């Protein structure tokens, strides 16, 4: 399967999971903006202090979102296949993130 076909499959999966129906042209336009990331265990998609530039769709793997409080890591959320991941305040306000987005295992995610 080539990258364009993969992007279309992922776009369909996202739309299906949220009950969204798109025309073929709109689905292809959506697929065109999906950016694939193959990442290793421990990789950080977003680090504390970085601005979150994507909403991520988890195609394969596990993603941990956490923050630090009094030098202790506090789990905010764990996401898996089919989930969306975002540091919402950072993404929309364009401010440095207080949340870290890290991979718990080798993963494939698509940035939107």
Give short role names for the model-derived ranges.
Residues 1-112:
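Cytosolic regulatory regions built on CNB/CRP/Popeye-like sensor folds
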